[in-house]
UniProtKB/Swiss-Prot annotation:
GO cellular component, one term: cytosol
Record keyword Iron present: no
UniProt organism field: Dechloromonas aromatica (strain RCB)
Binding site for ATP: 16-18, 269, 312, 316, 413
Gene Ontology molecular function: ATP binding; glycerol kinase activity
Origin organism lineage: Bacteria, Pseudomonadati, Pseudomonadota, Betaproteobacteria, Rhodocyclales
Stored Gene3D superfamilies: 3.30.420.40
Family that this chain belongs to: Belongs to the FGGY kinase family.
Annotated protein name in UniProt: Glycerol kinase
Coiled coil feature spans: none
SUPFAM superfamilies the UniProt entry points to: Actin-like ATPase domain (SSF53067)
Keyword Transport: no
Binding site for sn-glycerol 3-phosphate: 16, 86-87, 138, 247
Residues binding ADP: 16, 20, 269, 312, 413, 417
Swiss-Prot/TrEMBL catalytic activity: glycerol + ATP = sn-glycerol 3-phosphate + ADP + H(+)
Length: 502
C-alpha cells in the first residue's frame, strides 16, 4: 500500500457562527485546525443575514492558515472536501462574482407569511411529496423568491442568465474554481424546496409556483467525485474539490451511520437528528423531513431528519441576551450546581419551533418560575430544553421507522457537555455514544473527498476507523421520565402560535 503519511485531505467547514478548515490524515485523525467567526446580522426581528463575501474571505483565510500554521504544502493535499450550513441563500452576479444582497440564513423567518399563503392555497402537499420537506421559511426556495421580489430588476436579470443562485457550497465552489463551476450536490439541493428527491433533479412545477427561473440554478453533481478544481491562486496549487455535503449529512457520513437504522444527533447552533433509511426515501407521517444524505457511485442514500432550531444557540442567548453566563463553557458547572430544574422549563422557540411541531409563530417562553428560582435553574432548564427537543424528534423518528434505536451517536460542540449527554440518554432510554473525533461534520466531508481520489478505499475502511470516546447509559426511572415529558409538553403547548403572521 502506498505510504500516505505525509498526505492529507483538507476539509472546509462553513458553519453558521464560524468558518473552519481542518486537516485529516489517513486514520481520520486531525493534523491541524484554523477557525474564524462569522458576523451575524439581525436587520429586523426574525431576520438573520450573513455577508457572503465575508464568508468567502474567511473560508480562504482559514484554509491558508491551516496549511501555513502546520507546515503543510499544497502538494500534500490530495483532495478538498466541503461542508456547509444548509439552506442559507446567496444570489450573485455571474460576471462580477458579487452578491446582490446579504445571504439569508437558514434561521431567518421573513418568509413565514409566504409559506402560510402557499399552504392556504393548497400547495403544501405537492412540496411535501416532491421534496420531502414541509413548507417552511427554513428552506431556501422562499428565501430566493423573496430576493427576486425585493431586489429591483433581479428576476428579469435572472431570466437572462446574468445571476446565479446557490447555497453556501455553491457560492464557495464558484469562488474557489474562479467562477468555472456553478454546482451543488443532492444533499444541499434537497434542502431548497425546489428539488425532486425521487428523480434527483430540479422541479419545474415548483419553480413555477415560486416564479424562480431555471437559469439561476446550479448543476447537480455527486457528493463524492470530480466536482471542481480549486484554482492554484488560492492555495498554491490546483487541488481537486471532490466532496460536498450539507453539514448534517456530512456529520452522518462522518459518524459512519452508513447502515439502515443508524442515527446521529449533532448539537450545534441547532440540533439535527438524522437516521439512515437506505436507498429509498421514507415518507414521514410524524412531521419529519425526508432528505438526501449523499450520492456516490450512482447510488443515493436517504435520511429521515428532525431539525431543532435552537440548540447551542440557546446557550448563546443565555450569554449574549440575558448575561447569565460570560462564556458558553460555564453553563455545565452552573447547571450542575442544582439537583434538578426546580420545576423550570425553557421552551427556546426564539425563531419558532422546528420538528415535529413546525410552528414559525411559536415564541420562546420560561415556565414554572418561583421566588426560589435561580440563574442555575434557568441554566439547567436551557440545557434540558436541548435534550427535550431532541427526544421529541427521536420519538417521531422511531414511529416513522417502525423500530427502536439501539444507540444514538452524538457530535457537535454541546456533545462535550457530559451533563447534557447523560440527561439525553436518560430521556431517550438508550445509550448516547460520543466518538473520539467529534469534528464529524468536517470528517464526513473529508471522507467523501478522500473516497473519490482513493485516499480511503471503501466504506468498510471508514467503519473500522470509528472509535467511541464515552458511552452514556440511561439511568432514569420510567415514571420520572414520563413526568418530565408531561411538564415539557405542557410548556411547549403554551408557546405555540404566539406571534402573529404579520
Amino acid at each position: 500500500m502506498q505510504d500516505r503519511s505525509d498526505q492529507f485531505v483538507l476539509a472546509l467547514d462553513q458553519g453558521t457562527t464560524s468558518t473552519r478548515a481542518i486537516l485529516f490524515g489517513r486514520k481520520g485523525d486531525i493534523h491541524g485546525v484554523a477557525q474564524q467567526e462569522i458576523t451575524q446580522h439581525y436587520p429586523q426581528p426574525g431576520w438573520v443575514e450573513h455577508d457572503a463575501e465575508e464568508i468567502w474571505q474567511a473560508q480562504l483565510a482559514v484554509a491558508r492558515a491551516a496549511l501555513r500554521d502546520n507546515g503543510i504544502l499544497a502538494k500534500q493535499i490530495v483532495a478538498v472536501g466541503m461542508t456547509n450550513q444548509r439552506e442559507t441563500t446567496v444570489l450573485w452576479d455571474r460576471s462580477s462574482g458579487e452578491p446582490l444582497h446579504r445571504a439569508i440564513v437558514w434561521q431567518d423567518r421573513r418568509t413565514a407569511g409566504l409559506c402560510d399563503e402557499l399552504t392556504t392555497a393548497g400547495h403544501a402537499g405537492l412540496f411535501r411529496e416532491r421534496t420531502g420537506l414541509v413548507l417552511d421559511a427554513y428552506f431556501s426556495g422562499t428565501k430566493l423568491k423573496w430576493l427576486l421580489d425585493h431586489i429591483p430588476g433581479a428576476r428579469s436579470r435572472a431570466e437572462r442568465g446574468e445571476l446565479a443562485f446557490g447555497t453556501i457550497d455553491s457560492w464557495l465552489t464558484w469562488k474557489l474554481s474562479g467562477g468555472r463551476a456553478h454546482v451543488t450536490d443532492p444533499s444541499n439541493a434537497s434542502r431548497t424546496l425546489l428539488f425532486d428527491i425521487h428523480r434527483c433533479c430540479w422541479d419545474e412545477e415548483l419553480l413555477a409556483l415560486l416564479d424562480i427561473p431555471m437559469a439561476l440554478l446550479p448543476r447537480i453533481v455527486d457528493s463524492s467525485g470530480e466536482i471542481a478544481t480549486i484554482a492554484a491562486e488560492w492555495l498554491g496549487a490546483e487541488i481537486p474539490l471532490s466532496g460536498i455535503a450539507g453539514d448534517q449529512q456530512a456529520a452522518t457520513f462522518g459518524q459512519v451511520c452508513l447502515q439502515h437504522g443508524m442515527a446521529k444527533n449533532t448539537y450545534g447552533t441547532g440540533c439535527f437528528l438524522l437516521m439512515n433509511t437506505g436507498q429509498a426515501p421514507m415518507a414521514s407521517c410524524h412531521r419529519l423531513l425526508t432528505t438526501i444524505g449523499w450520492q456516490r457511485q450512482g447510488k443515493t442514500t436517504y435520511l429521515l431528519e428532525g431539525s431543532v432550531f435552537m440548540g447551542g444557540a440557546t446557550v448563546q442567548w443565555l450569554r449574549d441576551g440575558l448575561g447569565l453566563i460570560s462564556s458558553a463553557d460555564q453553563i455545565e458547572s452552573l447547571a450542575a450546581s442544582v439537583a434538578d430544574n426546580g420545576g423550570v422549563y425553557l421552551v427556546p422557540a426564539h425563531t419558532g419551533l422546528g420538528a415535529p411541531y413546525w410552528d414559525p409563530f411559536a415564541r420562546g417562553a420560561l415556565f414554572g418560575m418561583t421566588r426560589g428560582t435561580t440563574r442555575a435553574h434557568i441554566a439547567r432548564a436551557a440545557l434540558e430544553a436541548i435534550a427535550f427537543q431532541s427526544a421529541d424528534v427521536l420519538q417521531a423518528m422511531e414511529k416513522d421507522a417502525g423500530q427502536s434505536l439501539s444507540e444514538l451517536r452524538v457530535d457537535g460542540g454541546a456533545a462535550r457537555n457530559d451533563l447534557l449527554m447523560q440527561f439525553q440518554a436518560d430521556l431517550l432510554g438508550v445509550p448516547v455514544v460520543r466518538p473520539q473525533v467529534t469534528e464529524t461534520t468536517a470528517l464526513g466531508a473529508a471522507y467523501l473527498a478522500g473516497l473519490a481520489v482513493g485516499f480511503w478505499q471503501d466504506e468498510a475502511e471508514l467503519t473500522a476507523l470509528w472509535r467511541a470516546d464515552r458511552r452514556f447509559e440511561p439511568s432514569m426511572a420510567e415514571d420520572r421520565r414520563s413526568a418530565l415529558f408531561a411538564d415539557w409538553h405542557r410548556a411547549v403547548e403554551r408557546s405555540l402560535h404566539w406571534a402573529n403572521a404579520t
